[in-house]
Amino acid sequence: ALRFWVVLIGIDKYDGYPLRGCVSDARLIEKYFVDDVGVPKDRIQLLLGSEDHASPDDPMYPSRTHITDMPHSLATNDKIEYGDNIVIYYAGHGSCYSYHEDDEDEDETHEYIEALCPIDCDTSDSNGVPIPDISDRELNSILSQISHTKGHHITVILDCCLLRRH
């Protein structure tokens, strides 16, 4: 039998630029995995940015820390066997940052870093340090760690755009 482990992240409640439907989409995907695929609820982890989960102390609050810790917890979870199916779904804001890189063959190369925006993006931590988005490079590193310890059956679904440019 196929074994699934699912991480669902849906963020509606951003300060200044809220979204609608991300939390309900994550809940609908949860329903699909439970009702249609038969995944036990204890194998589904939710991070939801809504009025019901508005406190950073809530373990379901989709802060940068909680989002980046959750995939790491998959890599170290002894119950997940090598080759099990892992699905990570994200619905929320995305971002895109341009940067310039010197290239020997070209004068200048324009590249982009794409990123996921946690609920606490555009805020600062307790030391006043700005909380960064989760870059594509960081996400790749996290997925590589999961792949190394749990196998290559990882599906990532990103329901976001990259309109917030910096």
Predicted regions and their residues:
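Structural beta-sheet core signal
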Residues: V6-L8, L46, V156-L158
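Glycine- and acidic-residue-enriched helix-capping/strand-helix junction motifs
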Residues: Y14-R27, K31, P132
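Caspase-like (clan CD) cysteine peptidase catalytic core
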Residues: R3, P59-A91, S95-H166
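RNA-recognition motif
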Residues: Q45-E51
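Second-shell loop/turn segments in exported
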Residues: Y14-R20, D52-M60, G128-V129
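Terminal peptide-recognition signature
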Residues: G10, I29, I88
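Short glycine-rich His-centered loop
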Residues: A1-Y17
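Signal peptide-proximal N-terminal region
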Residues: L28-R43
